[in-house]
Amino acid sequence: MTCFAARYPLVAMFALVAAASLGSAQPASGPVTAFKFQFGAEKAAAGYTLVSPALKYSKETGYGFESGTTPTTVRSDTGDALHRGAVTDAQPFLFSVAVPEGNYRVTVTLGDPTEEAMTTVKAETRRLMLERIRTAAGKFVSRTFTVNVRGPKISTGGEVN
């Protein structure tokens, strides 16, 4: 599952969670697998995995920012531990999580601790999940959506590009 964010003029993705949940991602069906990622903070809140903008996707971790996309960190000393950091960039950036095929309930928390933000989220770099979600400086909103993940292999042979 790949999450794509574009900034117009400012995008911040904060506490992206994935549990077969991305921010938090959970499968909408099947065995529950949960990932809770916190972006941009100095220290992760309890139960979250800290993700720095420098963390590149690897098969070993199963998650990270895709090559060629390096957001920057925004931090604030105000607010609770979960809302003290964010990642942002003037260009789109991609964060991927390796998950098996299935339907996933994904919750993202969007906002920026210091500036107004406008965020667009796409799944697998193409499917629009959230468009131009605007948040005021220091304000955060959570949104939940379902992502259907399918591999390129077809069970009867062949492959989808």
Kindly label every feature range from the protein language model.
Residues 14, 22-161:
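Compositionally biased, intrinsically disordered or flexible polar/acidic segments
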Residues 1-12:
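Bacterial N-terminal signal peptides that target proteins for export
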